[in-house]
């Protein structure tokens, strides 16, 4: 695979510049945008022709290329998909992840049979390493590898970097530990995370012996201490037994509990632990709403929009059932077989013509008439942990109607409890119509209901275009709080804790031009 940056898009073709400064024309993909880093192989390349690549050599494009080549060489973007580090995770399932410089998982390999079993259910490609590890923990709990009792469960993470620079090694360790520790501490299970950096030689030895880097380093440590351990026993023994009484891989914040609080000022890493815990105290929760008392009114649709949709449904249905308007007897012909409403205003002689007309609706009494718009929403959460700082959404919307749908008329709502008032941010990471065509805003459920006091409303720009009957649009999105406090998703109305693939999900509602077309409101 090769890496390139998109510098021009024209219909079904895109011009990219490679790491070596070459121009290539490739087939355009859904969601492609200027400046995007993409992977391509020779099959994607369109043969050069005078009308295609030739225009790339204009002065303007050449100037852009100079910038991109500088970015490649100076910022090291050539490592975008190249493996920057190998990270082995030992729980009992042992799995190795290959990640790029941005901490995105590019590949994964099981290191034992349990790892193979869990990896089959893991969605890891192009996901953040921290999220994948949390998902691995969740799957390990599901299969009983992590016990939900007072027993300590050790997770050993070992990493080998392709870079020899100590600063990069330190940065990688700090980011991974800082991101994972709070998430693991918030789980309702006793987990101790340990972390070690392995050398390239140690990784090579671990590969030769088909064991994780962490366990190979435990083997080396045992041999240095004169213990007669074999690699076979290392592989079969639990981490809790192997590391009993050992401080191997213990993270700085765990080494000194609270014996000498003075040392927390001397060691910056220990001070970090002390600063993490205040975010959990109720003080911060009180401060946040105090900063923004106007927050309820600032919410995009604390407005009656949410209520208006609900109330609009019931009156409409209520007026169609009664016979207020004799013009519409055909809406419910089966409920009044005598067709009294039809003969009431017409001459009795024409009553014989009325039944003939009532037979026609029986062909399609419930079918949508021509031009009717309807959708179906399929969904899953990419992270099923009940407590997390980020809520992920994978959504697939299908046009089930018989008319084109202007996506700018479509709104989707995901309902949840905010738990503690804070500003929130929405991000669309990818969409089949382009992430830049997806919008997100937050609103209040008024009055709040069981499992729902807030919703995120997903919309689409005018540029998103039309969705034809039978076609679908996919998107990967997420939202979080700006103060990085946690969500408890366990009781959230729209949370899907059981699936890792698309399922029809009626707890996300879909509206077309403000009318509910899919789902059940809380």
Swiss-Prot record:
Membrane topology: Single-pass membrane protein
Stated name of the protein: Anti-sigma-I factor RsgI4
One CC-aspect GO term: plasma membrane
Subunit (UniProt): Interacts (via RsgI N-terminal anti-sigma domain) with SigI4.
CBM3 domain ranges (all copies): 371-522
Extracellular side: 73-522
Name of the gene: rsgI4
Main location: membrane
Induction: Up-regulated in pretreated yellow poplar (PYP)-grown cells.
Keyword entries, A-Z: Cell membrane, Membrane, Transmembrane, Transmembrane helix
Domain RsgI N-terminal anti-sigma as annotated: residue spans: 2-49
GO molecular function: cellulose binding
Job of this protein: Anti-sigma factor for SigI4. Negatively regulates SigI4 activity through direct interaction. Binding of the polysaccharide substrate to the extracellular C-terminal sensing domain of RsgI4 may induce a conformational change in its N-terminal cytoplasmic region, leading to the release and activation of SigI4.
Domain notes: The CBM3 domain binds to cellulose.
UniProt superkingdom: Bacteria
Region (Disordered) location: 311-371
GO biological process: carbohydrate metabolic process
Localization of this protein: Cell membrane
A Pfam short name: CBM_3
Residue intervals on the Cytoplasmic side: 1-51
